[in-house]
């Protein structure tokens, strides 16, 4: 878990993630099922996929840190996800709405990571959506083609969690 790495290094870290259950079906594959502090089984309030979600250790109390940058209001539509990026832990923190034409909950995390990092570097939030709209995946990833009247999408899965996410996106 990233939080356990952040706790071991002197660098400043900013915890971010989806703040709340999304209602999407989570997989049962997890890279991290045990507490990095005491090795007891972790408990989750909700799981997005893999090890991502709200976790805590009932044995030692270690858990997901407070999210300093939050993704809220995640909604899946026919053409991708819409969500809000909140630039603080407070309910009334400044936020911007983002829409991505790519499906897969992992894209919400990818977009959030890139945009929160850009924000930390001083990029104005007004530039976020136009930048995403101009994005073209490399190497055929997430490519879409019309073949015989149907839309075909290609994607890449490099590990069991990624493969499970692709299967879930088909459902």
For the regions a protein language model found, what residue spans apply to each?
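Short, polar loop motifs at secondary-structure junctions
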Residues: 1-4
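A conserved, hydrophobic alpha-helical segment in the catalytic core
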Residues: 54-57, 99-133
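Short, glycine-/Ser/Thr-/acidic-enriched flexible segments
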Residues: 90, 105, 158-159
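Active-site beta-alpha connecting loops in nucleotide-dependent enzymes
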Residues: 26-33, 39, 138, 156-171
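Glycine-rich, charged/polar anion/phosphate-binding loops
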Residues: 68-70, 99, 165-169
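Gly/charged, well-structured mid-domain segments that form the phosphate/adenylate-handling core
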Residues: 62, 117-157
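Glycine/charged-rich beta-loop-alpha catalytic/anionic-binding loops adjacent to active sites
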Residues: 90-100, 145-150
């Amino acid at each position: 878990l990233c939080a356990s790495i952040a706790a071991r290094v002197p660098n400043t870290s900013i915890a971010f993630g989806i703040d709340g259950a999304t209602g999407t079906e989570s997989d049962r594959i997890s890279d991290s099922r045990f507490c990095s502090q005491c090795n007891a089984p972790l408990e989750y309030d909700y799981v997005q996929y893999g090890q991502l979600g709200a976790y805590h250790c009932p044995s030692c109390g270690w858990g997901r840190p407070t999210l300093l940058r939050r993704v809220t209001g995640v909604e899946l539509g026919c053409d991708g996800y819409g969500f809000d990026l909140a630039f603080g832990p407070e309910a009334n923190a400044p936020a911007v709405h983002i829409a991505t034409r790519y499906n897969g909950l992992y894209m919400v995390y990818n977009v959030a990571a890139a945009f929160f990092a850009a924000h930390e570097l001083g990029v104005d939030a007004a530039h976020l959506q136009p930048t995403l709209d101009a994005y073209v995946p490399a190497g055929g990833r997430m490519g879409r083609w019309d073949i015989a009247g149907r839309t075909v999408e290609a994607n890449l899965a490099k590990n069991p969690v990624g493969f499970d996410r692709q299967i879930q996106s088909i459902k």
